[in-house]
Amino acid sequence: MEDNKLILALGLSVLFVLLSKLVSSAMKPRLNLPPGPWTLPLIGSLHHLVMKSPQIHRSLRALSEKHGPIMQLWMGEVPAVIVSSPAVAEEVLKHQDLRFADRHLTATIEEVSFGGRDVTFAPYSERWRHLRKICMQELLTAARVRSFQGVREREVARLVRELAADAGAGGDAGVNLNERISKLANDIVMVSSVGGRCSHRDEFLDALEVAKKQITWLSVADLFPSSKLARMVAVAPRKGLASRKRMELVIRRIIQERKDQLMDDSAAGAGEAAAGKDCFLDVLLRLQKEGGTPVPVTDEIIVVLLFDMFTGASETSPTVLIWILAELMRCPRVMAKAQAEVRQAAVGKTRITENDIVGLSYLKMVIKEALRLHSPAPLLNPRKCRETTQVMGYDIPKGTSVFVNMWAICRDPNYWEDPEEFKPERFENNCVDFKGNNFEFLPFGSGRRICPGINLGLANLELALASLLYHFDWKLPNGMLPKDLDMQETPGIVAAKLTTLNMCPVTQIAPSSAEDAS
């Protein structure tokens, strides 16, 4: 009898909970959500993504072509809106920028980004605004970027000499440009950030590579963030955290070594002059010493800012440069025109400087066209809705993640003629730029969360590209034809070229010797 009463009580309790949920749901106003594909229990819309393409930006474009430029998806229990037109992007990133100023964090990215406390992934807040202000007014000003001109020129000259030696050695196997260009980018960012080459660089890059692999795919914790069990069983967040701890340890060593060096210089009476390349770390240590910033520049702050510098600057430029070289090999006409412009600008010189490339309009068009076709982040870093709002007549509830498919927008035939073709001339006499105001072309984002390192990334990219075109002609290895180049992309946050780019340099203008370049 007692058992029957217990069962009855339990049944009534369950019924009460269900009725309460039904009543609560009925009392809520029905939302006019954006259209989207049909969903399945638990996984939501995921089956539509995995069935179409390993590159999620391609799958999303295919779905948007059917459901419209603003589309609702469910990533497990996480609501997401996909934006695939300039008009909707402008509404989200400009007119309602503040409402969408937060970041969407997966469980793995949260672990890798210090709990979402770095500049890239931190939520919109006073702290984030002050950290970004330090970046924009102290680390990434035009004057600061120009101050590293000598660093860029020396590192690029070193690469050119290595390639000239490879060309002299002959052979048809080609040079692995992915390795060479990645090393160049990492050396530039290390010297600019901490004042010299870093003995811990390879350790840091190895940990970064592991972290990048973990954030490529969604884990069960990303699909069900409210579930503690999902968080416990998910492997990627744990691996991401382990990688981040390795990277943090390297950065803390670098900071301490620099502090020790500055103390030794001060004790020896060398002072600021010897300390002195005024790298990013030196600037941050000076701000730490002086105090007075709204957010104290603690060692923890220095760690996350250097982390953003290392990871951001060493990723974008080499990815884009590899795509440019691949496209130029597939389009000999554009290659010849770009080479002619560079060689005319620096005729008779054995070394390109940044002063030589200021007026190279066609080179800049080539870079723009590569950014259009191969935006490093095909989906802009996702925003998160801070308050319920409406976009294009549709309700967007608070907490919704918003993904702008810039890859699809940059291939929209309504805005781009022959959108799949590599045609730098489309930017001739065209005011469209990537600074955040032309919403059909936003490779670096727009609004409050636009990439703060645009000028630094472009400076690294332009000089390297100009130098490779100035000194060398290029051919593909082992008799490969341009049409045989694999132009597939890697899946994940960054759409790099899937296969390694191997090319054979043929020296046309011999570089200066190491002694002349120093």
From Swiss-Prot:
SUPFAM superfamilies according to UniProt: Cytochrome P450
Claim: Transmembrane is one of the keywords in the record: yes
Membrane topology classification: Single-pass membrane protein
MF-aspect GO terms: heme binding; iron ion binding; monooxygenase activity; oxidoreductase activity; oxidoreductase activity, acting on paired donors, with incorporation or reduction of molecular oxygen
Coiled-coil segments: none
Transmembrane segments: 6-26
A GO CC term attached to the entry: membrane
Subcellular localization(s) per the UniProt record: Membrane
Residues annotated to bind heme: C451
Catalyzed chemical reaction(s): ent-cassa-12,15-diene + 3 reduced [NADPH--hemoprotein reductase] + 3 O2 = ent-3beta-hydroxycassa-12,15-dien-2-one + 3 oxidized [NADPH--hemoprotein reductase] + 4 H2O + 3 H(+)
A Pfam family of this chain: p450
EC code(s) of this entry: 1.14.14.69
Keyword Transmembrane helix: yes
Key words of the record: Heme, Iron, Membrane, Metal-binding, Monooxygenase, NADP, Oxidoreductase, Transmembrane, Transmembrane helix
Cofactor: heme
Biological process annotations from GO: diterpenoid biosynthetic process
Function per UniProt: Enzyme of the diterpenoid metabolism involved in the biosynthesis of antibacterial oryzalides such as phytocassane. Catalyzes the hydroxylation of ent-cassa-12,15-diene to form ent-3beta-hydroxycassa-12,15-dien-2-one.
Family of the protein in this entry: Belongs to the cytochrome P450 family.
Protein name: Ent-cassadiene hydroxylase
